[in-house]
Amino acid sequence: SIHLQYLDSSLVPLSKEDYDISDKSVIDKLTDLNPDVVIHAGAVTDSNVVNRNPISAIQTNIIGTAHLAQYCIEHNKRLVYISTDYVYDGVEGNHNETDPVLPYNNYAWTKLGGECSVRLVSNHVIIRTSFGNPKFPYDVAFDNLVTSKDYVDVIAPMILKIVKSDVTGIINVGTQSKTIFEYASQRNTVLPTKLPTPMNFSLNLNRYEQLF
């Protein structure tokens, strides 16, 4: 949300300390704030943390999302939910929005759980995407993991276009298919390494490209 604020000063980032979505009181706080649209990017995203403390992940990623959905339903607000490409199975790649989902890990299962409540909001959009910090944080990167992931400064403007539109439903957001090694090498010097099993989470981006 901070990156989105850099692009549009009318957007107001909300801190976890003041707006803890796992606490139902967040509904009353949002009622007082009265936003035009809710952009939900908050989540427990570290898969290791999710595995170690699944209850916390459930409280934030699933129950917290349900709280935001409840607010948006009760007050007729637009809800923009940042989901993950990992809800797809990662087998053949080029996943489109109507493909069956089979989350890759527990983190992705919690994000799919969040999607379920978001779908009940009449004016909702679910953005399936993947992005990283402006600099790749590791010295090695997988050359057999294919993705449409890009850096947050690339993806954030794409998300903002959706926020300002009247698009609803599910939409994939990313850039051209590449390996994680190729992605990392755009901005860093890294060495290639391999997953035990090759995976392909690349996204079919036709819907986004047709709309924007």
Annotate each predicted stretch with a short phrase.
Residues 44-48, 52-55, 85-104, 135:
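Active-site "gating" loop of Rossmann-like NAD(P)-dependent oxidoreductase/epimerase domains
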Residues 24-60:
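NAD(P)H-binding glycine-rich loop region in Rossmannoid oxidoreductase-like domains
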Residues 8-29:
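Adenosine-cofactor binding site in Rossmann-like domains, unifying the SAM/SAH pocket
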Residues 158-204:
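Mid/C-terminal beta-alpha module of Rossmann-like enzyme folds, strongest
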Residues 38, 52-80:
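NAD(P)-cofactor binding segment of oxidoreductase domains
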Residues 136-163, 169:
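Substrate-positioning beta->alpha
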Residues 1-8:
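N-terminal Rossmann NAD(P)H-binding glycine-rich loop of SDR-like oxidoreductase domains
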